[in-house]
Amino acid sequence: MENIQNAVIGEKEISKATEILRKYKQGKLNLEQKIISNEEFFKLRQWDHMTGGESDPKPASAWLFNCIISKHSDAMDSFPEANMLPRAEDDKAEAEMLSSVLPVVLEQNDFETTYSDVAYYTLKNGGGVYGVFWDGSKHNGLGDISIKKIDFINLFWESGITDIQRSTHLFNTEFVSNELLEQQYPELKGKLGQSTITLAKYLYDDTVDISNKSLVIDWYYHKMVNGVKVLHYCKYVNNTVLFATENEPEKYPNGWYDHAQYPFVVQRLFPVEGSICGYGYIDIARDTQEMIDHLNSSILKNAMVNARPRYMVKNGAAINEEEYADLTKDFIHVEANSVNDDSIRAVETTGLPSIYVSVRDGLINEMKECTGNRDVANGGTTSGVTAASAIATMMEQSGKISRDSNKAFYVAFRKVVNQCIELIRQFYDIPRQFRITGEMGTQQYVEYSNAGLKPMAQEPIMGQDMGLRLPVFDIEVTAQKASSYTKMAQNELALQFYNLGFFNPQMADQALACLKAMDFAHKNDVMQTIEQNGTLLQQLQQMQQIAIGLAQQYDPAFAQQLILMAQQSGQPLPQQQSGSAEVSGGEHPYVEKAREDAQSVADPDR
């Protein structure tokens, strides 16, 4: 812990920061209440927030739950991957290496699980947060990137903004065991007690005890130093500073992270003004879900009343009511001459008209339409549609809302990758080993450091020093896991190209002209392959001309063999107009041309 007397950040600064934290907490009370209530809806506990009789049935239907898990499956079907594109020719090799190394870093962080958790959180509450940190304890002290899901309840920012990077201060909080804190910071013994800040809590299924835990606060803030924005960081508990970058200026001259951004990335589902968190599917459809459940309750109550007949028994009627109500009794005892139609009578009930069931079904359809969770998106079909291609097309068309949401997720993923690159630039000074996937799926073992990401000297222009250049990359995000429909369409397109002869080197020019007017995934790769095939064909034809010309000059019999081999290889000779040209009755025109070319090569002055 820093020397408190000479520290820039001390108890006074911590008290001011805590007051700012309280102000930020007050500004997001409504958001916290919404998140806690949404979690109860997701757990099918909506009746805890709805009115109803004590004895009334309380069915909790899962239509809203089904919507969320359906949207989540769409998000995971389009799990993203990043491809780094250089902005300068000199950075091409570094971009290719980053494109191979970063997926390994994400995999080591179990990013797919984190992406899934943040997607669920975003779909439920309208927003989610990634935390992108440098964890110096990883790899036995070597350190590495750590990516975590952050809960809005534990994060505090300036109210009224829509970009978290514009917040003056930022606080991330977490309850940590007192025993663990005292082991890590021995100077805290006897100083840990009840925190002055209380956090909103979910309605957990388990009993969560935080009596032996203390609230640890990570405080991030910006300062301008010589006209440059610098990110500073302070960790404290109660009024005790555990760490502060401003207290160690020699070690942290550029602040906590060189990129000077808050290490948090926020994504929104349906944006709303004045908040970094938007609206989720529970916010949109919870009222409809409540009405569906109320109608279900009334329908079930009516069904139960009609399914179990009740009787009115006149006072004084000599009927054994217990035997009458017990269906296992074959005999019911009554007084002689005491039973008639007036003694006992069934209570007449009225069945529920079908209009109410239709209203309930209409509400269900309303929810499906408003959330874009139609039956066809989950594999269902409308009557009369049986063709597989038609079903696949309908499923693809019904997923446009999910594709729009995935685009928002990709924007956040791009920011996460960008922060990862900046952390690699700052901390990967020591080379480390990676197993990457090379061309054709082969495994390669490479050594990588940040040497190619550091500022580089530029070549002088007319003797003028141009200073340093920082390698910068554009990040292209694509779906790593495409849906079955997308894969099928892509494969069918490739087969169509093959059947149409696009990969035939003789048709390279026509194929390239056609592809320039098309738009599909990996178009540039296909065009590059076709162009290479055409170039190889031209080179092969030139070599054939030279070989046949030389053979005709020194060994005419062998020249004819070369001509036949060229014809049998499936590659037509350039001057041959028909595959049935005669070569025995006279000199083949191709041989004639080959001889002329060979002679011109051997004797340029001829």
Regions found by a protein language model. Name each.
Residues Y236, W256-D258, P263, A325-D326, ...:
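Residue-level "hotspot" positions that anchor or transmit function at local structural transition points
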Residues I217-H222, V228-V230, L242-A244, K251-N254, ...:
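Sequence/fold signature of self-assembling virion shell proteins
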